[in-house]
Amino acid sequence: MKSLIPVIVSCMVLSSCGTTALYYWGGTSNGVTKYEQLAYKSYNDQTPESICKLIVVYEDMVTHPKGTRNVPPPGICAEYGYLLLNPDTAELFAKHATFSQRSIFDSSDYRQLFRQRGEEMMEKEMAFYPESTTFIAPLIKRLTE
């Protein structure tokens, strides 16, 4: 009985050492997250379909954050905001998004909606990660002028 106590204690200690992720980057497939796959594809291919899919992934990551901190991963709000503040993105989304992709937004005026949402995302990035203010504040100023 005395020889089992160290084994049981060791098992308990080792089982409590599991790590939990601070941020959720999307489901993985072979170690590559869905976000990484879509981001790589949309920035390299620049196809309307891949950009529409990326917008949906960003929106999900921002509105339903997972992980122990329950906030979007660092840089996601800024990337999403930058994409939305691009004037071509709203037009591209209006023309090429599927019905289910469009249903995540309550408006059909994507130009105005994306501009507001883009600025909001940049502000969220600074709120979640204050150290990013040095970079994000001038970027907001430049993009919204």
Task: Briefly describe each language-model feature range.
Residues D109-P130:
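TPR/TPR-like (Sel1-like) alpha-helical repeat modules
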Residues V13-S16:
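C-terminal motif of bacterial Sec signal peptides marking the signal peptidase cleavage site
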Residues R69, Y129-I140:
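Boundary/linker segments of alpha-helical solenoid repeat arrays
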Residues M1-K2, G18:
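N-terminal hydrophobic targeting signals that begin at the initiator methionine
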